[in-house]
Amino acid sequence: MPLIGDKFPEMEVQTTHGLMKLPAEFKGRWFILFSHPADFTPVCTTEFVAFQEVYPELRELDCELVGLSVDQVFSHIKWIEWIEENLDTEIEFPVIADTGRVADTLGLIHPARPTNTVRAVFVVDPEGIIRAILYYPQELGRNIPEIVRMIRAFRVIDAEGVAAPANWPDNQLIGDHVIVPPASDIETARKRKEEYECYDWWLCHRSASGD
């Protein structure tokens, strides 16, 4: 089972948009792969609508979105049609029709419920490296804005060599500022308070360059 910091496993998958090779299909871009337990289930349906709502925003962030469950492709297609006809939402992102091989590779099958994929999220960067993995129980839907926030934060983190505080960009202490990495030597530590806003030399912050 891959972990944070590992390369996303290479695989060819059948999707509602045809065959795809991952992660090569999205080389040079971020992508989010999310698994759902099953088609035609209530929580998953609300999640698909919510993911579609933010899909244009994700694409503006150069990030793609891919769904997955252990269902046949015709089930995915029929469910997507139902969502469009009944909920007035066209699902534009591809959904992987998995036979179980992909789910096994990614560790998405829980022994207690071997016929359904767990509710998981993999965030993969433009180099094909897994940057975050999230798991949710079947009875709890995902917080979709948090997933978008992660993409926004990772882009700033990578571009500027900084860290993002809790609840960024609405942190209780430093607002939309980002955290400067702590000094690694005495001389730099002494200069930190002159260069940045700081609570102490090891907790300094600044505005993001894009601000």
UniProtKB/Swiss-Prot annotation:
The keyword Endoplasmic reticulum does not apply. GO terms for biological process: cell redox homeostasis; cellular response to stress; hydrogen peroxide catabolic process; response to oxidative stress. The keyword Iron-sulfur does not apply. InterPro entries: AhpC/TSA (IPR000866), Peroxiredoxin (IPR050217), Peroxiredoxin_AhpC-typ (IPR024706), Peroxiredoxin_C (IPR019479), Peroxiredoxin_TDXH (IPR022915), PRX_1cys (IPR045020), Thioredoxin-like_sf (IPR036249), Thioredoxin_domain (IPR013766). It holds the Pfam family AhpC-TSA. Residues 2-156 form the Thioredoxin domain. Its main location: cytoplasm. It comes from the Archaea. Keywords: Antioxidant, Cytoplasm, Disulfide bond, Oxidoreductase, Peroxidase, Redox-active center. The active site is at 44 (cysteine sulfenic acid (-soh) intermediate). Gene3D superfamilies: Antioxidant, Horf6, Chain A, domain2, Glutaredoxin. Substrate binds at residue 119. CDD domains: PRX_1cys. SUPFAM superfamilies: Thioredoxin-like. Its EC number is 1.11.1.24. GO terms for cellular component: cytosol. Disulfide bonds join 198-204. Coiled coil: none annotated. It is an enzyme of class 1 (oxidoreductase). The active site is a conserved redox-active cysteine residue, the peroxidatic cysteine (C(P)), which makes the nucleophilic attack on the peroxide substrate. The peroxide oxidizes the C(P)-SH to cysteine sulfenic acid (C(P)-SOH), which then reacts with another cysteine residue, the resolving cysteine (C(R)), to form a disulfide bridge. The disulfide is subsequently reduced by an appropriate electron donor to complete the catalytic cycle. Belongs to the peroxiredoxin family. Prx6 subfamily. Thiol-specific peroxidase that catalyzes the reduction of hydrogen peroxide and organic hydroperoxides to water and alcohols, respectively. Plays a role in cell protection against oxidative stress by detoxifying peroxides. This is Peroxiredoxin. It comes from Methanothermobacter marburgensis (strain ATCC BAA-927 / DSM 2133 / JCM 14651 / NBRC 100331 / OCM 82 / Marburg) (Methanobacterium thermoautotrophicum).
